[in-house]
Amino acid sequence: MGKRKTKEDNASEDYDANELMIVPGEKRKKLEKSGEKSATGGKKNRNFAKEKEVAKLTKQAKRKLAAVQSRKALKQTQEELFAGLAEFQLDPSKLCQLSSSTKLSKEPEKAPVFPEKLKVFSGKTKTEAKRTQQDYYPTDDESSSEEEEEEEEGDNDIEDAGNTVEVKIEPIDLDDVDEAIDGNPETNLDQIVVKREDDEESDNEDILALPTTTVINRKKVIVERSKEIQKSRAELPIFAEEMRIVEAINENLVTVVCGETGSGKTTQIPQFLYEAGYASEGELIGITEPRRVAAIAMAQRVGVELAKPDEVSYQIRYEGTRSETTNILFMTDGVLMKEMEQDVMLKKYSVILIDEAHERSMYSDVLIGMLSRIVPLRSKTARPLRLVIMSATLRLDDFTHKKLFPLLTPKVIKVDARQFPVSVHFEKRTPDDYIASAFRKTCRIHETLPPGAILVFVTGQHEVKQLITKLKKRYPVVYETDKNGEVLVKGTKEWKEKKVEAAKSIKLEDFKEETPETEDFEDVDDGLMDGDDMNERGAAEAFDDYEEFENGDGDLSDGKVENSIGAPPADCEPLYCLPLYSLLSMGKQRRVFDETPAGMRLCVISTNVAETSLTIPGVKYVIDGGFEKRRLYDSITGVSRFAVCRISQASGDQRAGRAGRISAGHAYRLYSSAVYQDFVKFADPEILSKPADQLVLHLKSMNIVKVVNFPFPSAPDEQMLESAEKRLCRLGALSESTKNGKTEARITKLGKTLAVFPLAPSYAKFIAMADQHNLMSHAILLISLLSVREPLIPVSSLRGDTPEETKELMKNVLKERRRWCSHTGARRLGDLKVLMHAASVAEQIKYNARECEKVGLRVKALVEARKLRQQLTNIVNASCKKEHAAALDSDLPPPTDQQAQLLRQMVVASFSDRLARRVDRSVGQEEVQKGAYETTLIKGHVFIDPCSVVFTEEPEFVIYQELVQVNEKKLMTSVCAVDKEWLSRLAESYCNYGEQDKNQEPIYDPVKDMVVKTVKVTFGPLNWELPNENRSVPHDIMMYRYFALFLLDGLVFEKLKEYTPKLLAPPSTMVKSWAKLQKRTEMLLNKLIEKEVTTRSSLKEQWLKNENWLLEEYLEWVPESVHQQISLMWPPLEDHEKTIKMGRNKKY
């Protein structure tokens, strides 16, 4: 405390004071980087900067300084060299379009270039340009001193999670970095980002979240083509875009190619990718088509152009040519969906092309949604997957929105079509009858305008036939024979030349009366007559509809149009009229592609099938009626109907574009421009207008529980998806379960079985049930016929040469169909039996077109049904373990009475939602039309189709396959009669059960094997009354008491009945309020509760495990005198129910 300070102490205090004065000097980092040690002490006011200048450099420092100076000199020389080369550099706008072959697209698409720098190191670059690709390279970190750098060399590399720019990857000395900064004061220091430890976690999350584009060095393929093929390819608009398209696909995970129909997208892009090496390492190039015809035709065309038909295959619903040598595979979108169920990552494919995406079919929309999640996952593997969406319209928002592709932005490439200019002509006033207007417009074009094919768009087959009939009548094909015996067609160019020559050498004696021979150019049995389907309008009464059709309606039928435009010119050339619609046979559809007879003008009358699916050659004039016939489906009620609706603006533009394929054309729109402006821009996609049951089931089978959250390009209505889930739950394909307070519908074992079949779930269930009674062949036959469109020609569409012949033909066909199901047992199977017999008749006559048409069969639909039948047979044999494989029997015998009854019961179990009940006209004051039915789906009355074989019988309950609205009526098609008593047992999920009467005594139902009470039963929301039903009592202690009562009473096991009179207490003791006071009742009750035994089957299971189970408890109820007898008999099963081991472990 009182110690005196010495001189040394004072010196120490001075030293400490000086130390405090130089502490701030440590903060100057640049001094630390010089390599000299910092001061630790010294004299007061010491000048360290001056001492550093005069200090001698060590040998090591001199070497480092010399190295730095040499690098600076080298850098200056290289900068001068780069400055000289920059004079010969391409313009940046052209340079960005080229792709480097040395970097293999490791850079982002719009990577900034730094030509003024010698070297560029990796690091985060703050730019506004949006990056679509990322690679992560290590880079050197800055250290606080050179000594720390030498000590920690190799440990300070970091991984940058930002966008990187890499010109040359090599080790970089920090001295170079310092010199670059010092020598270039304009360098942005923010470009050099040092990762901090606290940023590591977030950067890792970014790496996982954002997909990367890995470009693989693929082996290019050289293809040798003929000169003709090369010339035809060069004429396509897309051919000049090969480099741009291939580079975009290489550098982007998803690419959208937009080009007009006919630009060559479908045939050329697969060849571009093939040559780029996308199939060089055993992977496939997959192309999906919405139609089977397109898949087959495109595969054949690409195979010819590549000169390698073995490497280009197709796979459609019923057939395919896929083999081990296949490299390019065309398929329908449904085929790829089924393949995705087995391999969700599509590991066999290197690229998937979705063609005709603008048509928005249900499967293509689901495929795009699935691939939008698969592509980012595959990008993290060694073999990434590319997705190419090809569309013919500019509606691209549906394919690029963020909900569909949240982690990336698809690259959009627009291909300009080599379209000739098309002049679009609107009507000043929209006509009321567009058919009459189309007829007038066709006549004026044919009579006044230059040559060129005419394409007329109408709504349906009825309009096609009506217009062709009038045009053929006005412009018939007339044959004349000249004096040399040569047959010529009147009006053709050759005929006119012959007339001129004949006029020069005319003589009076050559004149004589001749009658020209007039006949149709086509045969009488042209598919035009037979292909009509007036059932779209309806068939209230067959011949009445026929007369209405023949009489016609509007101006076109009464001759006013012909009178208004006058007679055609005498030398007018004939008009070669052809129909085109979807139900026309393939052979007759192909006639529009054949060469037009010489001297005639082609005129195609078509539905909207010619809008995008087919390109008709030579079309110069298009007449657009502005209407189309759509099949509208109510997702809630299930009612479908055909309705004539206005087209969309996109459809109108597609139709007009058909006129500009070969030369400048004209499009005549039979509506005003104001009406066109009122059209919707785009039609609703198919996924919004079709039942979603099959869609939901397929998504559930892929473990997609929340279908509502699926990334659809155009999301269906939530109510539509929920209704589909409810129907699937009632069908047994889904089951609802609650987890964490949330109710979810998950797929069941039955649902997984149904998802195997390419059918609606109700149809698939019908086949799944058929194996129980050896009805698989009959079930497959019936479902294949129900799955195709109209295998039977509607009676109202049949035609004869005269009205009398037509009436007789309708009568005979309807009589023949009723004869097919005249057998007593099969009659109630109704129209389903007619379909099965029709297939048998078609097999017998070998699907001969003429013979089938005589009995009212549509050959095209029956052939399609046979292919589906073969496919379903193969699926059953491959997927189901059966002792006897199902066979495609062409001589399948008709179902017997018992089989017909079983088939009707299967119909009830599978199609319960399509039940209808006949309205009792004697009940209620409202006047009800005869033959009216009511159904659970819609309000109002429905009726059986008059052409149905059960039309006259009017069963009380029927099940239909479809409701079709015809005029003011809703008609049920494919009707089958069912029994009322089956509903509560086979359609239990649709039944409503009343409350059990508390005063009613339960009984044991040996059929259901449960303790039951009788309750009232009603069906559906309309509460149709059904016979009373026995329902299980609540699962509580009283259920166990009553089961024990019936067990003691001998009602459960017949062998115990003889001991009932000998019981020490009546069995009713079990249900008394004081029963727990007796030991025997509690012992028996507790034993049953312990194993939860309330049925005969569950009790039998316990005896199979332990044959003495419940013996001790039962012996408490009987006298001791019968104990040994009961012990020998126990368990009281029938002899055939006992196993061999029973009796070895008896207790006596």
From Swiss-Prot:
Q: What is its EC number?
A: 3.6.4.13
List ligand-binding residues for ATP. G259, E260, T261, G262, S263, G264, K265, T266
Q: Where is the composition biased (Basic and acidic residues)?
A: 1-10
Please give one Gene Ontology molecular function term for this protein: RNA helicase activity
Database matches in SMART domains: DEXDc, HA2, HELICc
Q: Name one Pfam family in it.
A: HA2_N
InterPro entries from the entry? Answer: DEAD-box_helicase_OB_fold, DEAD/DEAH_box_helicase_dom, DHX37-like_C, DNA/RNA_helicase_DEAH_CS, HA2_WH, Helicase-assoc_dom, Helicase_ATP-bd, Helicase_C-like
User: According to the UniProt record, where is the region Disordered?
Assistant: 1-51, 101-163
**Residues spanned by motif DEAH box:** 355-358
* Keyword Protein biosynthesis on entry: no
- Name the top EC class: hydrolase
Q: What's a GO cellular component annotated to this UniProt protein?
A: nucleolus
Instruction: Please name the CDD domains in this protein's record.
Output: DEXHc_DHX37, SF2_C_RHA
Q: Which residues form the Helicase C-terminal domain?
A: 463-703
Q: What is a biological process (GO) this protein takes part in?
A: maturation of SSU-rRNA from tricistronic rRNA transcript (SSU-rRNA, 5.8S rRNA, LSU-rRNA)
User: What residue spans carry the Acidic residues bias annotation?
Assistant: 138-160
Q: Which UniProt keywords apply?
A: ATP-binding, Helicase, Hydrolase, Nucleotide-binding, RNA-binding
Function summary: Probable ATP-binding RNA helicase.
Q: Family per UniProt?
A: Belongs to the DEAD box helicase family. DEAH subfamily.
- Protein name listed in UniProt: Putative ATP-dependent RNA helicase rha-2
Species in which this protein is naturally found? Caenorhabditis elegans
